[in-house]
Amino acid sequence: MNAENDSSLPKPQWIYRVGIGQDSHRFLSESSAKPCILAGVIFENSPGFQANSDGDIIFHAICNAISSVTHRIILGEVADELLHTRGITDSSVYLSEAIKSLKSNQMISHAAITIEGNRPKFLPKLSAMRQSIASALNIPLGSVGITATSGEGLSDFGCGDGVQCFCILTIMEYCG
């Protein structure tokens, strides 16, 4: 008997979708006045990123994870339009647009973030970053996990040339 074809089985009310996103940027020179922003949190004493936007790789990775579920390209399409027509470089605005692309029966239930970079020092601001992500995604703080690694000098990120982020999102979709 094939369970998929058995109409006597109850239809699940929720299905789970998993989105994955990645982003990375190189640092600007040390003399740059552009701030280093990660998850909407400013890291003093670290240069900003080479990017048309504020370069927030964490919010960008989350946008890409949402796009992997919604099939609506935010970075490269929506964000570029916002930048070129309205001058918007704030990645939190791009993230808001990504969230709007979710269907009305979809909601983010968990975010797992991993960051690789030799600088800045992530640990002192991990709590603020988690709070910022939870607020932006409208999910409980306990539903946001962040890990960070220095990279031990094994990649450009580990050597301090930039920072890389991966994001996995769990998205619940009601189908009842």
From Swiss-Prot:
Keywords: Isoprene biosynthesis, Lyase, Metal-binding. Its cofactor is a divalent metal cation. One of its GO terms (molecular function) is metal ion binding. It comes from the Bacteria. InterPro entries: MECDP_synthase, MECDP_synthase_CS, MECDP_synthase_sf. The keyword rRNA-binding does not apply. Pfam families: YgbB. The record marks 52, 150 as: Transition state stabilizer. A divalent metal cation binds at residues 23, 25, 60. PROSITE patterns: ISPF. Binds 1 divalent metal cation per subunit. GO terms for biological process: isopentenyl diphosphate biosynthetic process, methylerythritol 4-phosphate pathway; terpenoid biosynthetic process. 4-CDP-2-C-methyl-D-erythritol 2-phosphate binds at residues 23-25, 149-152. Homotrimer. This is 2-C-methyl-D-erythritol 2,4-cyclodiphosphate synthase. The gene is ispF.
